A protein has these predicted regions:
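Active-site glycine-rich loop that binds ribose-phosphate moieties when present
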Residues: 131-147, 164-168
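N-terminal phosphate-binding loop and adjacent alpha-helix
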Residues: 11-29
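C-terminal beta-strand edge segments of enzyme domains
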Residues: 217-344
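Short beta-strand scaffold segments in enzyme catalytic cores
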Residues: 98-100, 111-114, 147, 244-246, ...
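Active-site-proximal beta-strand elements of phosphoester/diester hydrolases
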Residues: 4-15, 42, 111, 124, ...
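Short hydrophobic alpha-helix segments
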Residues: 118, 124-125, 257
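Cys-nucleophile CN-hydrolase/nitrilase-fold catalytic domain and related Cys-dependent amidase chemistry
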Residues: 19, 28-117, 187-209
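CN hydrolase (nitrilase-like) catalytic-core segments centered on the catalytic cysteine
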Residues: 76-97, 155, 161-265
Length: 344
């Protein structure tokens, strides 16, 4: 049976002064997409409450107030903001991919959240390496988030912005046979060169992985740019750089991309195109050479606290009997190693 789903890449501006308002705007966009028959909607990078554009155009010594405001408006996951989006996704029967500034106690993270069509969060991942100015704002993610998940729309993977220039991060998702890659960029940055580079990146990933790419970028109005910085020279750094698009496994646009203003790119994804591409070049299957080249990925969630403990000494009645192979190995739960008497 032929599989076809309708996807939307949504180019949208945050409400800089109202994080809750941005959440409501996202929910309205989900309803609007649902009216168009959309089954998968992808929103831009850290849309909620907004991408930290201030860190790109202001020196660190002057951005303390803006940094504090971002902390105040960043969202816990789960929390009221994600619950509102989950409800909208559930009502629309839609898979939603959303970028948020996640607050985890005293740290902020660039997080991507995938909501399944029933509203459940099936993936929350954090950008593994914040880029350039972003390192003053966000902490780092871990390898556990480089995961493809099953959803009502298919097998989904996600990366944010320049993570796409980390070929091993992309390959980690490719080896899990992602069918739809959900890409997010901030948009409204750097100018046309950023949009051009972005298009090359997403089209290349579609070709290399043999999957669809749904890419969403943000947008800033002139008034918002002026609010971020009154300096004309710096305002140029916050214009252009948008390429909201949907790409086929053959590397072609399935609908005209959106470069300016708010809007929605909608296209039908015919999954037979994945087979059409992969029958000739499956980079993690018949076209791979794992005995020559392969990937090692650490899937353990990052932790800053590891508990070491020692098991209680066994009684003689419960000691394991000796074997021809010698004494039994130490209990694997024991995390304290004591040197033998006389050892150095």
């Amino acid at each position: 049976m032929k599989r076809i789903i309708r996807a939307a890449a949504i180019q949208i501006a945050p409400i800089l002064e109202d994080g809750d308002g941005t959440v409501m705007k996202v929910c309205r966009s989900i309803r609007e997409a649902g009216a168009k028959g959309v089954q998968l909607a992808v929103f831009p990078e850290t849309l909620i409450p907004y991408y930290p554009y201030f860190s790109f155009v202001r020196p660190p010594v002057l951005m303390g107030g803006e940094h504090m405001r971002l902390y105040d408006n960043a969202v816990p996951v789960p929390g009221p903001a994600t619950e509102a989006v989950a409800s909208a996704a559930r009502e629309a029967g839609m898979v939603v991919v959303l970028g948020v500034n996640e607050r985890d106690h005293g740290s902020l993270y660039n997080a991507q959240i995938i909501f399944d069509a029933d509203g459940r969060i099936v993936l929350k991942r954090r950008k593994i390496t914040p880029t350039f100015h972003e390192r003053m704002v966000w902490g780092q993610g871990d390898g556990a988030g480089l995961t493809v998940v099953e959803t009502a729309a298919g097998r989904l993977g996600a990366l944010a912005c320049w993570e796409h220039y980390n070929p091993l991060a992309r390959y980690a998702l490719m080896t899990q046979h992602e069918e739809i890659h959900c890409a997010q960029f901030p948009g409204s940055m750097v100018g046309q060169i950023f949009a051009d580079q972005m298009e090359v990146t997403i089209r290349h990933h579609a070709l290399e992985s043999g999957c669809f790419v749904v890419n969403a970028t943000g947008w800033l109005s002139d008034a918002q740019i002026t609010a971020i910085t009154p300096e004309t020279a710096l305002q140029k750094a916050l214009r252009g750089g948008c390429c909201t698009a949907i790409i086929s496994p053959e590397g072609v646009h399935l609908a005209p991309p959106l470069h300016e203003g708010e809007g929605m790119v909608v296209a039908d994804l015919d999954f037979s195109l994945i087979t059409k591409r992969k029958r000739m070049m499956d980079s993690v299957g018949h076209y791979a050479r794992p005995e020559l080249l392969s990937l090692l990925r650490d899937t353990r969630p990052a932790r800053t606290h590891h508990t070491l403990f020692e098991t209680t000494k066994r009684t003689e009645a419960h000691d394991d009997p000796p074997t021809e192979a010698g004494p039994q190995p130490a209990d694997h739960r024991s995390a304290i190693v004591r040197p033998e008497v006389g050892s150095t």
